[in-house]
């Protein structure tokens, strides 16, 4: 919204700053961060008062988690609130990719909110049925995939970009939209599975979003794409503002989610963050790079898939418990140790993913 202040500029005054995506990204970061600090504690107090016993704890989960009983959930409301407010304030409203990513974020947040509400109100860990969540998630992803494809240049529609190879695209034809749907749905659920320890999901999500934001800015500029030999997607640069806001919102939330957590993000936050990452990857045509920068989420999801399939086939388990962060808990690792080491892994993967822009 503040972009329209450029209409007051004569080209050499302070209003001209609002033309620059990087300036507005900085503003979005600070706005979301301040939002988190201002409204975090009041929101936690409201959630604690409304929820009473807080998020239900699984009976078959790690023993150390029983001490977390009574901690309120739905803290994702703080993330989403800061993210939406900041993005709407600093991003251009005429950019279709910004609206697409915002739509996915809010829609998945609503699914997560319904799930969290069902869990808290019934005081069990079931929530909304898995089939219903999946169906709603697919519908959202279909809309987002078609939305992005419609706004991509004709030469990029239905194309899958290969990292490392110079401006190499594979035409998936009619398979592209189903592929994009899988990226968004898979990303949302992978982040959701990762959110099992205090601070575990939020930092890797922030790191992945920041990396994708840099990529979005790069592929949205002709000069950068010519230098890097990557495809040009006009309009994606504005997504940097969204990712900067996400980083600020994430820091604001982490202030209260750091061990021992005063609030959990719940499915409200994890589904929203995962959906946003998938939507950004689809918008920028960097779906495969998401698998690298979000590699931690991929591993967490794969650990569950492997565990379930292997157990059905043999009656035995590969991991002591899935997702894999619970496996390390069962092995005796302290929760902060797991969280910090997974953060480090996420940072390394993000650097590798970012390097794919240059390594051609």
UniProtKB/Swiss-Prot annotation:
Protein name, entry field: Phospho-N-acetylmuramoyl-pentapeptide-transferase
Alphabetical UniProt keywords: Cell cycle, Cell division, Cell inner membrane, Cell membrane, Cell shape, Cell wall biogenesis/degradation, Magnesium, Membrane, Metal-binding, Peptidoglycan synthesis, Transferase, Transmembrane, Transmembrane helix
Topology within the bilayer: Multi-pass membrane protein
PANTHER family the UniProt entry points to: PHOSPHO-N-ACETYLMURAMOYL-PENTAPEPTIDE-TRANSFERASE (PTHR22926), PHOSPHO-N-ACETYLMURAMOYL-PENTAPEPTIDE-TRANSFERASE HOMOLOG (PTHR22926:SF5)
Gene: mraY
Keyword Transcription assigned: no
Organism: Ruegeria pomeroyi (strain ATCC 700808 / DSM 15171 / DSS-3) (Silicibacter pomeroyi)
Subcellular location: Cell inner membrane
Source taxon at top rank: Bacteria
Coiled-coil regions listed: none
Function: Catalyzes the initial step of the lipid cycle reactions in the biosynthesis of the cell wall peptidoglycan: transfers peptidoglycan precursor phospho-MurNAc-pentapeptide from UDP-MurNAc-pentapeptide onto the lipid carrier undecaprenyl phosphate, yielding undecaprenyl-pyrophosphoryl-MurNAc-pentapeptide, known as lipid I.
């Amino acid at each position: 919204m503040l972009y329209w202040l450029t209409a007051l500029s004569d080209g050499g005054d302070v209003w001209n700053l609002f033309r620059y995506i990087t300036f507005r990204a900085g503003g979005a970061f600070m706005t979301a961060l301040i939002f988190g600090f201002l409204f975090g504690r009041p929101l936690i107090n409201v959630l604690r008062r409304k929820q009473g016993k807080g998020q239900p704890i699984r009976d078959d989960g790690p023993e150390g988690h029983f001490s977390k009983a009574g901690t309120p959930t739905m803290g994702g409301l703080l993330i989403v609130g800061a993210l939406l407010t900041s993005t709407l304030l600093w991003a251009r409203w005429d950019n279709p990719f910004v609206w697409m990513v915002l739509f996915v974020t809010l829609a998945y947040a609503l699914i997560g909110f319904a799930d969290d509400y069902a869990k808290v109100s019934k005081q069990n860990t079931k929530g909304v049925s898995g089939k219903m969540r999946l169906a709603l998630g697919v519908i959202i992803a279909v809309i987002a995939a078609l939305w992005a494809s419609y706004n991509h240049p004709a030469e990029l529609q239905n194309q899958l970009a290969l990292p490392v190879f110079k401006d190499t695209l594979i035409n998936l034809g009619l398979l592209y939209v189903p592929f994009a749907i899988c990226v968004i749905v898979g990303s949302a659920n992978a982040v959701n599975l990762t959110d099992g320890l205090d601070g575990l999901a939020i930092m890797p999500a922030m790191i992945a979003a920041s990396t994708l934001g840099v990529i979005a800015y790069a592929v949205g500029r002709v000069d950068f794409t010519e230098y890097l030999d990557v495809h040009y997607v006009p309009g994606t640069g504005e997504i940097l503002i969204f990712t900067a806001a996400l980083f600020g919102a994430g820091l604001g939330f982490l202030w209260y989610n750091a061990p021992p957590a005063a609030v959990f993000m719940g499915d409200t936050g994890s589904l929203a963050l995962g959906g946003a990452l998938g939507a950004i990857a689809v918008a920028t045509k960097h779906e495969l790079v998401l698998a690298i920068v979000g590699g931690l989420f991929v591993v967490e999801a794969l650990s569950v898939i492997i565990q379930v399939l292997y157990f059905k086939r043999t009656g035995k388990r590969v991991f002591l418990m899935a997702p894999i962060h619970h496996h390390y808990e069962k092995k005796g690792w302290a929760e902060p140790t797991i969280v910090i080491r997974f953060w480090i892994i996420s940072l390394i993967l993000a650097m590798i993913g970012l390097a794919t822009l240059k390594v051609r």
